[in-house]
Amino acid sequence: METATNIFSSSIYSWYEKHGRKDLPWRKNISPYSVWISEIMLQQTQVKTVIPFFDRFMKKFPDLNALSQASEEEILALWTGLGFYRRAKNIFAAKEIIKINFDNKFPSTFDELVSLPGIGKSTAGAILSIAYKKSFPILDANVKRVISRHDRVDLSEKKSVNKLWQLSDLYTPNKKIFEYTQGIMDVGATVCSIK
C-alpha cells in the first residue's frame, strides 16, 4: 500500500517523465561540476536569463580542471550581466578550496559541499541528488512553493522554513531521486508558479 508520501513523490517523478524540461543545457552531460555551476547561476535568477551565461561559462570552463586554472577576473568577466557577483566570487573561492583540500576532485559528501563558499543545504542537496543520485532534500524557491501549497504551510510563520525542510526530507524518495529532484523544481517553476 502506497503512503501519502510515496504518492506525492511518485506523482512528481511521473510528471517529470512526461512534462519535465529535459532540454535545459545543464540537464545534458550531467556532472557534479555542471550541477554546481547551474545551481549557483540559478540562485535568484530566471532560467531564460541563465541559459546563455551557462553556455558561455561551460564553453570556456567545461570541467573542474579548466576552471582550476581560471583567475577571478576571468570568472567575473563571464558573469558580467548576470548580476549578484558574490556568486562568481564564491565560485572562485570554492574552486581554490577544491584544488587545495580535495586534490581538484569535486566533493561528494554533504559536509564537504556545505563547507564550500556559496553552497548551502539546498545547493548541496541538488548536487548530491542530481549528479550523485543520492537521496538528499532540496528547498529552493520553487520547491518551497510546491510543498507550502501542497501542505498548506504559511510562509509568513517563523517556523515555516524548518517545517518545509522536514517535509522536503519526508517527500524525498530513495529511488528515482534524479527525476524527483528535477521534477519538483520544474513543477514549481512551470505549474505551481508565483502568483
Protein language model annotation of sequence segments:
Residues 2-6, 11-195:
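Catalytic cores of DNA base-excision repair glycosylases
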